Amino acid sequence: MLKISHLQKHYRGFSLDCSMEVQPGMITGLIGRNGSGKSTTFKALLGLIHPDGGEIEVFGKKAEELKPEDKQKLGVVFADSGFSMYLTAAGVANIMKSIYPDFDREEFLQQCRRFNLPTDKKIKEFSTGMKAKFKVLAALSHKAELLILDEPTVGLDVIARDEVLNMLREYMEENVSSSILISSHISSDLESLCDDF
């Protein structure tokens, strides 16, 4: 599913050398303190930054050779980014439907209601926990084969964190051949969720 071999990135005062593998049907955790290179690894994996060395394979292809249809199989959550705060959940659903052929708008809106996320309210009016749940739901909504989740529980209270982790568990039960790569600096989150570190 995913193989990273000696991924290297160097900045002033920072040097990354990361190797890891994510197997089909597994949840793999990437743990480390803030500033250890978790987000850098994810950004390189997604082609958002250019690595200084190493190799990344996704779905058996080099990351730089992924085609748009391959990228459709990825679901992504970054802790420090998301949707325009001026959109509603229904507005996001319309955008997602135009991007992802496998996106089920009605299922997405039903899941929003299930997790008490109003579909007609602007995202900027959501609480921190609501925004986190919404980002994860959006990443899950098009039946991604590989979820890349960068600190999806950061800043959440215990109840919201448990809800997000349960969303991921349910997804894996329903999509047994999918995989998740999740990062966190909270070891208890990963210990309760992951098959591998």
Residue ranges and their predicted role:
Residues 1-20, 24-26, 67:
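A short, flexible loop at the N-terminus of ABC-type nucleotide-binding domains that lies
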Residues 31-33:
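The feature captures the beta-strand-to-loop junction immediately N-terminal to the Walker
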Residues 36, 158-160:
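Helix N-cap at the start of a conserved alpha-helix in ABC-type nucleotide-binding domains
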Residues 46:
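Helix-to-loop junction immediately C-terminal to a conserved catalytic motif
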Residues 54-65, 69-70:
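Conserved ABC transporter NBD signature motif
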Residues 76-135:
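ABC-family P-loop ATPase nucleotide-binding domains
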Residues 147-151, 156:
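Catalytic Walker B motif of ABC-type/P-loop ATPase nucleotide-binding domains
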Residues 161-176:
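Helical segment within the ABC ATPase nucleotide-binding domain
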